[in-house]
Amino acid sequence: MKMSMFMEKSLAAMLAAGMTVSLIGCGGQTTESVQTEKAQQTTTAQGTSAGSETGGGEVTLEFQQWWGVELPDGVLKEICDGFTEQSGVKIELLSNPYADTKTQIAAGAAAGTMADVVGLDGSWVYDFAKQGSITNMTELMSADGYDDGQLSDQIKVDGNTYMIPVVNFAYPMYVNKTLLESAGISEVPKTWGEFTEACKKVSAANKGVAGWAIPLSTESPSGIQNNFMSWLWASGGTMLKDGKPALTDNPLMSDTVDFVKGLFDAGVVAPGAYSMKEADMVEEFTNGRVAFMTDSLAHLTTIKKEAPDLKFEFMPVPVKEGYTGKSGMDVANWGIGIAENCEQKAEAMKFVEYLMSPEVNARLAVYANAFPGNVNAKPDYSKADELFVKAYELYQQCYAINEFTGLPTSEELMRQFDEQLQLYIDGDTASTADMLSATQEIWQGAFQ
């Protein structure tokens, strides 16, 4: 995928109005104390012109991202050094924690001093593209004759690519095997109906245990993306049509709302959902108080470390009865883009192509505990956790999707949907149709 994880209220908000961050599992908010040796040069570097060329004709590209602090020490530098050996182009790493990186990139975007190559969160792309801060990568790929068919995804604005996901962090469904066994359930549920019944049995057999958890805190509304829409996407559904909101006249969306409300009505959802954040949900699952949750694969290591005796596995998100097509799996990613103010765009594009090459991309995916952004990459997960391998197999059976990526004010869209969903669950909105109609009207304002 890690989709959180991904805030200082600050310079970024003032200089890049309208930008919001969708907090998903791979956002990397946790390693804020670690920095690479180049991290402290960030502020100074942003005040200089990007894409510098030395007197001897050597090209140096600045690469600003948060990946370096989340990868094992030295890995990103080693990978970038490989590009230098191959091309002669030097890469200056500007690595900081996720929140700091977002602030610095936003400041650089407003001032026209953005680093040549930047790590991107999908929720930033629309605003940066509309600002003219990041460049049209479709044109660069075309000029290079680059085969974009090898890319697992491309984040587009107005039909043009502005971000390429380098590695993907998947959101499979976690299931507590012990709780299922206690309720006499021998097989994981495959459909919505089976899932509802499983949740009821688990709750009935275990006092103080919930069947399912969904974090619906409006302070961090990514539960709409990762825990609600994952039901829709798994059954082949969509919330958009031609890049615009399509919440009404959408039978599967309506059915998804009714299904989730039905889980609340049945009393099988973990209490405190309206104030729950993703970290709270993970804690509930880790402590054995929830049977099912959809969550980032990025939390696998943490859960196993904090609850070594917990028996759990991954499963596909159940689908609506009768659906036999391929399922969509929610993903988050480390994206990459090129600054419009970069003076060496051709070299910058070559660097992106290098990171997306099958061999390099596979290596990066392994170190990041993620899945590759190049469909031809073959990561060697032979030494990986067995559960990680199982998740990768599930991922390969699905198609990656996250329709919030690249949308204008994506986090605010989640919050608005969240608020309307809560009103419907509580009975303050009369019907599913009314709830979706109200949300559709609110959402359309962001697409004017």
Spans of model-derived segments:
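Extracytoplasmic/periplasmic substrate-recognition and gating elements
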Residues: 59, 81-82, 86, 90, ...
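Hinge/lid segment of periplasmic solute-binding proteins
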Residues: 48, 52-57, 121-172, 181, ...
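Short, low-complexity disordered leader/linker segments with a strong preference
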Residues: 1-62, 85, 139, 143, ...
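Short, solvent-exposed loop/beta-turn-alpha elements that line the ligand-binding surface or hinge
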Residues: 135-149, 211-222, 235-255, 305-306, ...
